[in-house]
Amino acid sequence: MSTLHAKNAAAFNKNPEKVTRHDKTFWKVRMDHDAAAAQLPEWEALRDLASKIKKHTITHLPHYLEQFTAKLESRGVIVHWAADANEFNGIVLDILRAHNVKKLIKSKSMLTEECAMNPYLIEQGIDVVEGDLGERIVQLKKQRPSHIVMPALHLTREEVGDLFEEEGISHEKGNDDPSYLTHCARLSLHHEFMEAEAGLTGCNFGVADTGDIVVCTNEGNADMATSIPKLHIVAMGIEKLVPNYESLAVFHRLLARCGTGQPATAFTSHFRQARPGGEMHVVLVDNGRSNILESEEHQQILQCIRCGACMNTCPVYRRSGGHSYTYVIPGPIGVSLGMMHNPTFEYNNVSACSLCLSCDSVCPAKVAPGSQIYIWRQSLSKIGKADPLKREMSVGMDVLFEHPDLYQAALRMAPLANLVPESMTHFTRLNPWGIGHTKPEFAKKSFHQLWKEGKVDGMKHKKK
């Protein structure tokens, strides 16, 4: 049974040049991560500390939420609570309508992607403009982000150049020079920032004991979105809290190094209250996070800081692209988040993992996304989504390994499979795995036989 991820990945792989570029680009980011980590002898200690801080915070969430909201409200910030995506979208719309807002400029926010806020507001007559360059590109392409940090990296410079020409952003036909395109985008976005009547930002971290909203960007779009319009709306998942500034310092040292290999993002902005003469709203969103918190097996998913490191290192993501995943957040962490939100559909992504666990080793908060996926695979039969063919094969393997004589007979007959033409193994229904893999060559003799015959270098079998 081929999943939707596998089918989408097959479509992505029809362009080998793009796949190679995608793979190499993200692997370079992984190498940059390693180089940045190597500069800090205390790197693993930071990861341990980050994991402990996050675990402590999410298991004491009511206390920290009360502390956080009290600090915000003491400075005149209006705090809202949204149980799910529909409530969140409705709250944002009500705030915008109360201020007669027609144009909203946004800083980057994966929470708004999760809640499908943009299409909802646009349907209600609000002009929503992404202020992050990568997000703006995919918005104009009518696509969703393919990565949570670098949302448009699946596109080539030629594709971006053509898009900017079509949209009237660039005016030199065929000019796809990155510096020129960036200059054109800057001019276009500056106009949008100046016209917007409200700005919306996400939130990388919320500091409980000070009430800080911390937003990390490389383009300064969060600062533009909050310093020009008088109305500032913050979209924040309830898991984004850290207890204090000391805790924040740990994550600040990890976030950019894990996400892009930088020591820090170019801009780290702290918002505590509205600008003079303005108004600030913070919308705290649950949208299934309480359910994750109740799950002993998957609670650690809430430790994720959305750095994207698991995607950068994942061999499946790098070679299949972010749009091959059915959930809005792709890659290893997206598999688990999708399963928590809608397992009967998002199970399509559970097979998108080689279980190499490279993602476990790079995750700054030790979420262990690969290990989480392994657990999810064990649960597929409970929700009626296990592949029946795989289940039958597993039963067959159990029988084979529990009967030594049968196993030895199968081992002796295995070389006969070498006579089967490789094309005959490419049956979509019976062997979808074979389509993307080279047929292995079976050895004429097993290692055990060679060892007994004394044909293994450095080892001799001693007969009793």
Locations of regions flagged by a protein language model:
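A glycine-rich phosphate-binding loop feature that marks nucleotide/adenosyl-phosphate handling sites
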Residues: 87, 265-276, 306, 320-321, ...
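Short coil/turn segments at secondary-structure boundaries
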Residues: 134, 263-267, 388-392, 424-430
